């Protein structure tokens, strides 16, 4: 699994900025993901002599009107290129004015297959890949275990966490944080099982879609504190699943422990770092990190069988292999 967060993006730009010519008059970001790197590239830049003479780029001035007659070299920037469809759409949108400018195209992250589709790219990041700015709405969440407190909603304050009426009020009215638009595979929380009605009510009110909700089956908060099993409880659910490829956890301490126990990656929303110091061979094969050609072959077979299974000639053996390939990638 290849993951990049905003710190990685900023570092990548700083490390590879020299590949871009310095004569671009205008940088155009592709909404929405391309706007952030576009702003980073368009920050005021100068050299020593220019600085001494008080000359800097004025990209930060609000309300400034640029004379388009002075714009000649334009760089269109997106965060990444995958299939190439988004970049192709950009070219089509700019087709009517491309004769007026020298327009070139840049992405920060490219896949090997489409790196030639742009004029500049900063880093090759192959599949499977995920970014901080899109992972919470990515289809990978369908194969993800996710914590609730600190991820979907704020953590309770010490005053609210009384295992009584104040806590029940918090559960029903917790302020939301990251609410995905896609379905989450499994919600795994250290909340006690007795608070399932309140938890489900909050999830429904905040339009959180999920397939499964796993809660800690202990009698009260005191028993939970004695057990001190937050990370091990979550790791047991995550590690026992062959479908779930990721765990999203709010606590860095727990994230590291879940990764250690399962040998599977954990995304920590405390820092938006991906923890995968410990890995298993099974995970590496399934994610494509080991023998990526094998994963590509499995995907091709899955897609081929999926199209074939709709026909009347697909027998039980065909359906069995289709199910196998679906679970394997």
Descriptions of predicted regions:
Residues 196-244:
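Substrate-recognition "cap/lid" segment bordering the active-site pocket of phosphatases
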Residues 278-329:
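Membrane-proximal basic amphipathic "stem/tether" segments
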Residues 106-108, 243-286:
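Acidic, Mg2+-coordinating phosphoryl-transfer loop and its flanking beta/alpha structural elements
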Residues 1-145, 153-174, 194-201, 205-209, ...:
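PRPP-associated nucleotide enzymes
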Residues 178-200, 214:
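Substrate-recognition element of Asp-dependent hydrolases with the DxDx(T/V) motif
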Residues 23-27, 184-187, 242-246:
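Short active-site oxyanion
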């Amino acid at each position: 699994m290849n993951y990049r967060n905003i710190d990685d993006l900023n570092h990548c730009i700083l490390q590879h900025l020299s590949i871009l010519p310095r004569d671009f008059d205008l940088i155009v970001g592709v909404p929405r993901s391309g706007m952030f790197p576009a702003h980073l590239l368009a920050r005021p830049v100068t050299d020593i002599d220019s600085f001494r003479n008080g000359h800097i780029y004025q990209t930060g001035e609000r309300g400034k009107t640029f004379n388009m007659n002075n714009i000649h070299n334009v760089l269109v920037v997106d965060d990444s290129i995958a299939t190439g469809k988004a970049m192709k759409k950009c070219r089509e949108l700019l087709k009517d004015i491309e004769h007026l400018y020298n327009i070139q195209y840049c992405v920060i992250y490219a896949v090997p297959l489409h790196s030639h589709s742009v004029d500049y790219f900063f880093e090759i990041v192959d599949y499977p890949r995920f970014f901080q700015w899109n992972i919470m709405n990515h289809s990978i969440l369908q194969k993800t275990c996710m914590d609730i407190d600190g991820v979907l909603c704020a953590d309770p304050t010490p005053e609210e966490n009384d295992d009584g009426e104040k806590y029940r009020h918090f559960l029903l009215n917790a302020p939301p944080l990251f609410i995905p638009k896609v379905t989450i595979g499994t919600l795994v929380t250290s909340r006690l099982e007795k608070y399932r009605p309140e938890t489900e009510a909050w999830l429904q009110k905040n339009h959180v879609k999920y397939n499964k909700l796993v809660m800690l089956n202990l009698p009260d908060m005191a028993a939970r504190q004695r057990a001190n099993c937050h990370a091990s409880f979550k790791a047991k659910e995550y590690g026992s699943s062959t479908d779930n490829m990721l765990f999203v956890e709010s606590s860095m301490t727990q994230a590291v422990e879940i990764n250690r126990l399962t040998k599977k990656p954990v995304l920590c929303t405390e820092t938006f770092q991906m923890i995968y110091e410990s890995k298993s061979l099974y995970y590496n094969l399934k994610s494509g990190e080991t023998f990526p050609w094998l994963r590509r072959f499995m995907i091709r077979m899955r897609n081929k069988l999926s199209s074939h299974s709709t026909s009347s000639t697909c027998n039980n053996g065909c359906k069995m292999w289709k199910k196998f390939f679906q679970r394997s990638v």
